[in-house]
């Protein structure tokens, strides 16, 4: 799939480790897809995450659901899985191997890479084949146990000024700070708990759409 930066507008990330069980995962994903997310990243990582055949079987269900709603699907740091289920994109962190090697294996997948500061961005800025950058954490987050120190709105703004890639902000983004993030002119925001722990996903996403 050809990447378009408008995909980054309302980016939802989730794995089974973020919710009670697989049934809850699928219920939340279905609601989020119906309610207007523009991109979904399947991220199984951390304590309690699925592996092997269980991960593959759930990923196939995720692929079917995202295809039904015409929402692009990104796989986090699992190239074999991304190709096996015909995902649309792949995402890598700073510790997920060399970007050049990952891009060589990506085929027709679009590629996202995480950075948390200007130095990390400058190291990958001129690597061909990167379609967008995930910048963060913007705020403190409990969704990722290995999260780096938050860079704040000022850190995000600085990266937006120097970057020549589309940027999606991530990390600790909730309804009460979303407007501050969007005011930087960033291409989109990526969230986990803002949707996965929402008591009303449809209302949460309607509010998000109204701010953009």
From Swiss-Prot:
Organism, scientific name: Leuconostoc citreum (strain KM20)
List the Gene3D superfamilies: Aldolase class I (3.20.20.70)
What are the protein's UniProt keywords? Magnesium, Metal-binding, Thiamine biosynthesis, Transferase
Identify the cofactor(s).
Mg(2+)
Signal peptide per UniProt: none
Q: Which residues bind 4-amino-2-methyl-5-(diphosphooxymethyl)pyrimidine?
A: 41-45, 76, 114, 144
Annotated Gene Ontology cellular components are: cytoplasm
- Family the UniProt entry places it in: Belongs to the thiamine-phosphate synthase family.
InterPro entries to which the protein is assigned, alphabetical: Aldolase_TIM, ThiamineP_synth_sf, ThiamineP_synth_TenI, TMP_synthase
The UniProt note on the cofactor reads as follows:
Binds 1 Mg(2+) ion per subunit.
**Reaction equation(s) it catalyzes:** 2-[(2R,5Z)-2-carboxy-4-methylthiazol-5(2H)-ylidene]ethyl phosphate + 4-amino-2-methyl-5-(diphosphooxymethyl)pyrimidine + 2 H(+) = thiamine phosphate + CO2 + diphosphate; 2-(2-carboxy-4-methylthiazol-5-yl)ethyl phosphate + 4-amino-2-methyl-5-(diphosphooxymethyl)pyrimidine + 2 H(+) = thiamine phosphate + CO2 + diphosphate; 4-methyl-5-(2-phosphooxyethyl)-thiazole + 4-amino-2-methyl-5-(diphosphooxymethyl)pyrimidine + H(+) = thiamine phosphate + diphosphate
Residues that, per the record, bind 2-[(2R,5Z)-2-carboxy-4-methylthiazol-5(2H)-ylidene]ethyl phosphate: 141-143, 172, 192-193
Domain of life according to the entry = Bacteria
Q: What EC number(s) has UniProt assigned to this enzyme?
A: 2.5.1.3
Provide the top EC class: transferase
Task: Tell me what this protein is called.
Answer: Thiamine-phosphate synthase
